[in-house]
Regions:
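Terminal, low-structured helical/coil segments at or just beyond the last alpha-helical repeat
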Residues: 90-121
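Structural marker of alpha-solenoid helical repeat scaffolds
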Residues: 33, 67, 98-101
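Start-of-helix register in tetratricopeptide repeats
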Residues: 39, 73, 105-108
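Register position in tetratricopeptide repeats
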Residues: 9, 50, 84-85, 112-119
Length: 121
């Protein structure tokens, strides 16, 4: 995923896409071997979302939240997905979960919801 993000930041989107596709295969394998890990589901959600499959990404995020409802990464990224898919009220619900964490994820999502920042993901 890191390599894909790096390519993306340099505008090399085709290379980034290939890295995300490779990461997705590895994450699916990892999830089969060790299921029900919130972090793995977060990465699966992120990777599928980056590949443009928002519906699948949302499913992974929601599975992760069933395991760990206060997972900062999942709540932030799911909130971003909701903003991108024009479901602001759902994004605000994710923000509400993060409000007491005093964390970067809260600030990032708030800025995106408020329109002060564009999601980089």
């Amino acid at each position: 995923i890191k390599a894909a993000k790096k390519y993306e930041s340099k505008g090399k989107n085709e290379k980034a896409k290939k890295r995300y596709e490779r990461a997705l295969k590895l994450l699916i394998k990892s999830n089969k071997e060790k299921p029900n890990k919130a972090d793995t589901l977060n990465y699966l959600g992120f990777t599928t979302r980056k590949l443009g499959n928002y519906e699948e990404g949302e499913k992974y995020y929601l599975l992760g939240l069933k395991i760990e409802p206060n997972h900062k990464g999942i709540n932030e990224y799911l909130g971003e997905l909701y903003v991108v898919t024009n479901r602001i009220e759902l994004a605000k619900q994710r923000l509400n979960v993060l409000k007491n964490c005093n964390c970067e994820e809260y600030k990032e999502l708030k800025d995106i919801i408020d329109g002060n920042k564009k999601s980089k993901y």
